[in-house]
Structures are given as structure tokens and as C-alpha cells.
Curated annotation (Swiss-Prot):
A Gene Ontology term for the protein's cellular component: extracellular space
Binding, substrate: K61, H62, Q63, N64, T65, K86, R105
An annotated Gene Ontology molecular function: RNA nuclease activity
Family indicated by similarity: Belongs to the pancreatic ribonuclease family.
Organism taxonomic ancestry: Eukaryota, Metazoa, Chordata, Craniata, Vertebrata
Protein name per Swiss-Prot or TrEMBL: Ribonuclease K6
Pfam family, one: RnaseA
CDD domains, A to Z: RNase_A_canonical
Secretion signal, residue range per the UniProt entry: 1-23
Amino acid sequence: MVLCFPLLLLLLVLWGPVCPLHAWPKRLTKAHWFEIQHIQPSPLQCNRAMSGINNYTQHCKHQNTFLHDSFQNVAAVCDLLSIVCKNRRHNCHQSSKPVNMTDCRLISGKYPQCRYSAAAQYKFFIVACDPPQKSDPRYKLVPVHLDSIL
């Protein structure tokens, strides 16, 4: 039993800093994390663009879509009619027009040497929106999750 406590303590220390793949960095609001992950008004090469995300999470994200639009324009989608999200919540909203976007997919590498392929697209998108937190931009609702691409 004496040996178990130090092993348990070591396990907790090693396990503590691990960030689940679906979580957002806690020092950011969900809206700010959405902006970092998905808003890119001017297209960047995927390897460069994804390094900004991967540096927060300390792993190679397998796939990510960048919307080539402003946060303001994407936040305006939150004012449109709400629809059901993939998770069955009713806080999703579909864009009224397609936008240019880039889909980045991991092809090789291990963090921090992640390598991505890029596919340019022109599609509609669906975002989940929530009320803003204190440090978020002042909108009635802000985008917090890219639910799907149509």
C-alpha cells in the first residue's frame, strides 16, 4: 500500500497537463478559441495556419476548416434562425450564403512537425452560438463551434 501512493501521485502529475482533444484552452473564451481555430480572412498555407492551433494544444489536430471571412460576418450568422446542431442542441445557425474556406487535413508528422494538405472550398457553414462571455466582443450571440460544412 505504501508503494501505491507514490505511483498514484506520479500518475496524477503526469496526467494533469494533458488537454483532451475536444477541449479548448481554458485561458481563452470559447468564442476566442473559435476565432483562432476557424477565422482566417486571408488564406494562409495550412502548415503555417495549423501551427498556431497546434501550439495551444501541443498535438497535431487531424482536421480543421478555416473560414475566409471576418469574425463580425460569422457572428452575424448567429442572428439567423436557429436550427438543430449535430449534438441535438438548438443553438446552431446556417450561413445564408457560401463563403470561401480551406480544409486542412493532417498527412504526416508528429507535433510540432505536423504536415497538412489543403483543399479550397466555397460552401455554406453551420455554427453553434452562445451568449458572449465578459471578454468576448459585444454581440447578442457569438460563434463557439463550427458544427458542419454544407
